[in-house]
A protein has these predicted regions:
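A conserved hydrophobic secondary-structure block that centers on an alpha-helix together
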Residues: 19-45, 51
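Structural motif
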Residues: 40-46, 93-106, 153-156, 166
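Surface loop/turn signatures of beta-propeller and other carbohydrate-active proteins
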Residues: 1-25, 54-74, 112-130
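Loop/turn-rich, solvent-exposed surfaces of beta-rich toroidal or solenoidal domains
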Residues: 75, 79-92, 100-106
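Conserved Ser/Thr-centered positions that define the repeating blades of beta-propeller domains
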Residues: 1, 48-52, 107
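Residue-level signature of beta-propeller blades and closely related beta-rich strand-turn architectures
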Residues: 36-38, 89-91, 146-148
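Entry beta-strands of beta-propeller and related beta-repeat scaffolds
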Residues: 29-32, 82-85, 139-142
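Beta-rich accessory regions
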Residues: 108-288
Length: 288
């Protein structure tokens, strides 16, 4: 059948950035959130329908006051007695030099504009963009696009551009989004190469640069974990001066600060898969 245009209406002041519809059914109604720029502000636009065929514009769900080009790839869903919106901030650098991240918003919603209580980055690392979630049985699962905004990917023939994060299960606790790998990820683990305790641990090289590590700290002080190294290029997970962050060396993003919202790290789960590293802090309090 021919494609059917279902949304033409958009609020006055909306420019050509008008994209990426995400549909969801809440109660007996259907809703679509669209990413847009309205009056030079990144905006989540909310549409509603009784039958998923005939749509009308409702209102701005969220208007972001920070100067960004537009909201891309918005998402919106109920979770743990709260509502969560997510959107990718296009052409934005934060105070640490990170480029184009995803933002989440947690709050209440009664059908009009969302009453936002808290907001934070979806991921404190690099290149997690256009994150989208879906409902699988009783789980809300998120997958992000690992892009290459810093131009660090070394392509090989036949080559590919970008990859995806691990599937992440979401929950809201204390009005913040907690993120953990879905339980199925752990079925991929192989043999244990080291298990023990100590302040200085050297494991050595690991075949194919693929490994999982679970680390717990008796004290929430400073530490440094070398996650990977290739000559003068390296990446570490570091706690120093009340901040937890990725420390980069010898790569194009080594001047960028990838700082977590976590101030005191009690534990970390580390997944390394070739060119990708994912770290989950404090049982899902933050991820990068």
């Amino acid at each position: 059948e021919p494609e059917k245009e279902i949304i033409r209406e958009k609020p006055e002041g909306t420019n050509y950035d008008f994209r990426d519809p995400k549909a969801i059914k809440i109660g007996e109604k259907y809703y679509i959130v669209l990413g847009a720029c309205v009056d030079e502000k990144g905006t989540f636009l909310l549409y509603e329908s009784e039958d998923a065929e005939n749509w009308k514009y409702r209102c701005p769900l969220i208007t972001e006051e920070t100067r960004i080009r537009t909201i891309e790839c918005p998402d919106f869903f109920p979770l743990d007695d709260k509502y969560v919106a997510m959107g990718a901030w296009m052409s934005h650098y934060d105070e640490y030099g990170r480029f184009q991240q995803c933002r989440y918003y947690v709050g209440d919603w009664n059908g009009d504009a969302m009453d936002v209580h808290t907001q934070q980055w979806v991921d404190f690392g690099s290149n997690c963009y256009a994150a989208q979630s879906f409902q699988h049985e009783d789980r809300r699962i998120l997958i992000g696009w690992i892009s290459d905004f810093y131009g660090e990917h070394i392509a090989t023939e036949p080559g590919a551009y970008g990859s995806m994060t691990l599937p992440r299960e979401l929950h809201v606790k204390n009005e913040h989004v907690y993120t953990k790998p879905v339980e199925e990820v752990y079925t991929l683990l192989g043999d244990t190469v080291y298990e023990g305790t100590g302040r200085e641990i050297k494991v050595g090289s690991i075949a194919d640069n693929r490994y999982y590590a679970s680390v717990s700290f008796e004290e929430t002080g400073d530490f440094n974990i070398l996650l990977g190294q290739d000559g003068d290029k390296s990446i570490s997970l570091t706690a120093e001066g009340g901040k937890v962050f990725f420390k980069m060396a010898g790569v194009k993003s080594d001047k960028v600060q990838f700082v977590s919202s976590v101030e005191k790290c009690r534990n970390a789960e580390i997944f390394v898969d070739g060119r990708t590293i994912e770290v989950y802090l404090n049982d899902g309090e933050d991820v990068g």
